[in-house]
Amino acid sequence: MVDKATTERKLKAPLSGRKRVPKKTAHACNYCHQAHMTCDDSRPCKRCIQRNLADSCRDAPRKKKKYLMDIPDEVADPSAQQLTPDAVMGPSPSTMTLSQSNAFMSSAADLEYSILGNIIHQDSGQFVGTDGTVISPSISTSDDNSHITPLAHYNGAIQGPAVYTKSPLNFEGSYAMTPIQRRTDINEIQPDLLRSEPSSNDTFGPTLHGEEPSCDSSTNQYFIGPSFSSDGRAQTLTFPYVVSQIERTKRYNPKEFRRRNKKSAISFSVGLMTDESSDKRDESITGLVYHEPSEIYSKIKRPYSYPQYYHSLILYLRKRFDKESLVAMSKAMAEYRPSFIAGTMNLKEDDLIFTEQCFQRTLLEYDNYISISGTPTVVWRRTSQLAYVGSEFCVLTGWSKEQLLGRSTFIVEILDDKSVLDYFELFSKIAFGDFRGATMTECTLLTPDGKKIRTSSIWTLKRDVFGIPMMVIANFLPILT
């Protein structure tokens, strides 16, 4: 049995007399790790100094987590980067001059021969250029810009970029992107700097159109829709344009781009017009011909000329598609054409006038909901002629309401070839066969520049009092995964 007095003497003994236990570190160096020996926090560690291995003492590489597998080691583990004496002292003047010159010439060449809005990820196949390859908003965290489309292939004003990254929210990649600046930063940048040529000091590179999209850096959320420029002018930031600006940030500041992406995946917030500005807007440009129910019943005196627009649709399809595609569309039309004929053959002129009044009255009612829904929405007739375009749809695609409603425009004109074929097949199924009249589908929208935006959409078919398809209400959202 241990004597109590002996135990007390040991406890009261000075600490210096005890054997010192080396403090363990959570991360051993490569040599101590291989030898399974205790290491310390200093670099080089004491054991490496004793063995004359101080120059090569590094933290042992750790096994990467799955979500970091495609990120370079120097980014995933900054501690792996060790400062050498040369790095501490800095490069010589001649080296510094040469590297700065090369950086400037590289940026200038990139500006001349590439357009950031047409970056296409080689594996994702999403947002596309005019050559037909698909472009969906997908952002790449890679620094490889070899797949940038030459500027000569770009002939539009609004950028429609691609964006790809392997983060929680993936735009077939993902939109885990970098906010370019805080909202207040936009007003702090000098206009002449925004339009200047890129240089070694131009961190973010040249600004397209001289404006940066607003972004909440704390949530990585970009703002699209109606806004004001730095000089107070009203403007609309479209989805394709904002994506192109994100790609520009990724190109000119890739390290900062990756760092910010770790915070959260990108998201978008669609701004709404203020009450003051909405009162001043021309409501007729949405597609509404009548703004009061009394106007509808007093001014509509003739039926709508559906046959005329069917002929216009057929002429357009013949100009755009080859024979094989036309045959496929004709087969789909042949399925519902007899039902249309049977449903309308007994209708009188007053009935046809009444159906047009119902169409305009329904459109007027839907305008109240669409204008506050915040979802990109369009409405078209059974001839596929656009009858109503929501403001959010213009923000999503880059089309203006004047372009879509200033003339007779068909929904198939802003769909890619595959989506047009799918449209007729889908319409033939829901026109008379599916009395629920609503279906989810995936389609690809075209921007004014010919780029493609993959979207998921829901189409709701509305019938008139005679059971004949009257209009299709379609809601679109860009595909992020």
From Swiss-Prot:
Cellular compartment(s): Nucleus
Keywords of the record: Activator, DNA-binding, Gluconeogenesis, Metal-binding, Nucleus, Transcription, Transcription regulation, Zinc
Primary location class: nucleus
GO biological process: carbon catabolite activation of transcription; carbon catabolite repression of transcription; cellular response to starvation; gluconeogenesis; positive regulation of gluconeogenesis; positive regulation of transcription by RNA polymerase II
Cited InterPro entries: ERT1_acuK_gluconeogen_tf, PAS, PAS-like_dom_sf, PAS_13, Zn2-C6_fun-type_DNA-bd_sf, Zn2Cys6_DnaBD
An example Gene Ontology CC term for this record: nucleus
Transmembrane segments: none
GO molecular function term, any single one: RNA polymerase II transcription regulatory region sequence-specific DNA binding
SUPFAM superfamilies given in the database record: PYP-like sensor domain (PAS domain), Zn2/Cys6 DNA-binding domain
Ranges of residues in domain PAS: 362-434
Residues covered by region (Disordered): 193-217
DNA-binding region(s) in UniProt: 29-57
Gene3D superfamilies: Zn(2)-C6 fungal-type DNA-binding domain (4.10.240.10)
Purpose of the protein: Transcription factor which regulates nonfermentable carbon utilization. Activator of gluconeogenetic genes.
Family in the record: Belongs to the ERT1/acuK family.
Protein name (record): Transcription activator of gluconeogenesis ERT1
Lineage of the organism: Eukaryota, Fungi, Dikarya, Ascomycota, Saccharomycotina
